């Protein structure tokens, strides 16, 4: 008989967190990951739920997420340990009927709680649900090394970061034509950075936190991981190019436009118009 550990969403979280740790993006308890589920996903595993689910109030109501279940990583938990003990490091939670709080249905044992970045995740989920008609289900935050490095040497401007990442690898414009948003430095784990991230997610599926990390949104764990992985690969190329004296030639504006036409995507116009 299968248990909730065998469920696709638990196995998917195990793989995503393990892969992210192996990439070097999630040292210690760095990074967090949430996946929005349907009632039909969790209903077969009701026998595994806690007998008395703990209730935790949200710092602000999230009516868009009312009655929605999620699987989330825990606060202070190490991604490298998720595969060793999923129930201690992950949790299935369900937002209540008015969006005021949530019950921990499974996991997060020994009084553990969801990630401290839950406000940023839930606010971003709310915005991406509206923007994508419910298609986006994943929010991933990690400390992608080369993306962080670039925030120290490039002007922290959305159009510039977008253009440079598009130029760093041909596939980038196809994978994130909506570009990369970037915030000012802010204290993590607060409603303020959560709100700013969510507002930026109205325009971009990738949001950089300077000197800290990146947020990504997508329809599946694979798509969201791949989104960040693609941007991080381009950032790695750019770090190497900058260390070798900078670009001598690159993909031009006209070539980027041609690329968008070939793959039927609409590139962020302000990034295209930044320079020839």
UniProtKB/Swiss-Prot annotation:
What catalytic reaction does the record list?
L-rhamnulose 1-phosphate = (S)-lactaldehyde + dihydroxyacetone phosphate
GO term, biological process aspect, one: pentose catabolic process
**What residues does Zn(2+) bind to?**
141, 143, 212
The top EC class, named as a word, is: lyase
Q: Which SUPFAM superfamilies match?
A: AraD/HMP-PK domain-like (SSF53639)
Query: Subunit structure, briefly?
Result: Homotetramer.
Q: What is this protein called?
A: Rhamnulose-1-phosphate aldolase
Origin species: Klebsiella pneumoniae subsp. pneumoniae (strain ATCC 700721 / MGH 78578)
Tell me what gene encodes this. Answer: rhaD
